[in-house]
């Protein structure tokens, strides 16, 4: 069974990597789905970078 953590974001560039690191430190294998609601900061760029580096990270941009 896979577990997916869904993380809604809106202008969270300062927090995305922090929460990602905390989730990654768990011993549970998780998929991570960021759902961004048209952030005006660099949130989407950070999310794209993470998704390229880690195969368990995906995103939806609205």
Predicted regions and their residues:
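Cell-envelope/extracellular polymer assembly enzymes that use nucleotide-activated donors
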Residues: 2-4, 31
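Conserved donor nucleotide-binding strand/loop of the catalytic core
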Residues: 30, 44-62
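A short, compositionally biased N-terminal segment around positions ~18-40 that is enriched
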Residues: 28-34
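Onset of an N-terminal alpha helix
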Residues: 10-13, 40
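Short, well-formed alpha-helical segments that are part of the catalytic scaffolds
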Residues: 12-26, 46
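Short, Lys/Arg-enriched, disordered terminal segments
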Residues: 1-2, 25, 52-53
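Conserved sequence signature across two-component system core domains
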Residues: 9, 35-37, 62
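A conserved acidic beta->alpha catalytic loop
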Residues: 36-44
């Amino acid at each position: 069974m896979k577990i997916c953590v869904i993380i809604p974001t809106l202008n969270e560039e300062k927090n995305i990597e922090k929460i990602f690191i905390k989730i990654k430190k768990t011993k549970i294998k998780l998929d991570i789905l960021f759902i961004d609601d048209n952030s005006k900061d660099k949130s989407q760029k950070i999310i794209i970078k993470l998704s390229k580096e880690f195969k368990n990270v995906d995103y939806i941009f609205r």
